[in-house]
Amino acid sequence: MVAPAAGAVILVQFPFSDLSRTKLRPAVVLADAGRGDWVLCQVTSRPYSDTRAITLEDAGFAAGSLRTTSYARPGKLFTASRSLMVAQVGRLKREPFQQIIHSVVTLLGAGGSQ
């Protein structure tokens, strides 16, 4: 079982927005939500036209890595139980992690209209 911590990059069954199914994908652990739940941010290898996406490259990892340059998507958050986390693949350095947190806070402060 994964022992998550803020800044960890883990593999988790990430739900589609319509909850029709899930896909195993990486996610950045943002915060402990209590009772074994964690707030996660979706990570993708596709550079969608998401202006909020934050590039994750090998240089941004304190440990581990992803197979390819990837993108954290601060507008794609969800809460998951620790039991759904399959593995930890890395841990971000402070700077990229803080960029993600700042983007989430900005998005929420703007009421989602950023």
Per-segment meaning from a language model:
Residues 18-20, 68:
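Coiled-coil-like amphipathic alpha-helices with heptad-repeat character
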Residues 62-114:
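C-terminal terminal-subdomain/extension
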